[in-house]
């Protein structure tokens, strides 16, 4: 009962008191999605070296699979899972998304580039690479594109200059530009917000990731970047043999976002540096169940 009162008092997006159970269920479903990173072992491009490819996936098969198996229509594609950036492939992929009654929320661009490089040739090459991916995201009719502002130790000034150019290009394509706490110079949340503010706060948004900050500082760091979030990467990391998430309190992360007034979509994701033998469909079920319960 306390949660229902809280939502009513704060004008929370769910408005639990005012919605029927059916409408509330639809509302929470519209705010839950999933990326392709969790099933990286089933993609030829990202499976562990030397491992057998079992039950393979491609981006072309993801939209229907996610709708049928997980009842998920909000999608996020990882750049490493694209087979091509050719127009014919992208058009076919866009049609698969549409045919499944799905929608592409974000493209995570992790190609080889460094927008904070002090080497001007490298910075210009990186800008050209990023523009190619923005073109692809626009052709796919993605709702947004995530670009990394620069590697750890890079130049903040070069990153700002680059992100200004990237943002101008995104504006031409009518694409929101997202920056995630993703192991570059933006891992300092104050630097992250400085880059956003200097490069284009009207179109540049944060993409808070539950699992990327050190656990000791994650709550404070997430709280700083959450007010500027467009979507949230609802990441789980390590699980024990009983299928319990052991890295941090996943539900607390969602509740932190809700208390901060976040009204957007949570994109479920799992990533760990440990070699774990997991049933990733069950992990996906666990994350989606937690999100649907918490919203």
Q: What are the language-model segments listed below?
A:
Residues 2-134, 138-139, 171, 201, ...:
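N-terminal pre-domain/capping segments
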Residues 34-38, 77-81, 106-111, 147-149, ...:
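A cross-domain feature marking catalytic cores of carbohydrate-active enzymes
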Residues 46, 74-75, 160, 164-256:
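Acidic/histidine-rich catalytic cores of soluble enzymes
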Residues 71-72, 137, 142, 229, ...:
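A structural motif
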Residues 78-89, 114-117, 150-157, 182-189, ...:
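Acidic-and-aromatic substrate-binding clefts and catalytic sites of carbohydrate-active enzymes
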Residues 94, 159-160:
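Membrane-proximal, non-transmembrane interface segments of integral membrane proteins
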Residues 102, 175, 260-264:
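A short helix->loop->beta-strand "cap" motif at the edges of active sites that frequently abuts
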Residues 136-155, 173-182:
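Active-site groove signature of glycoside hydrolases
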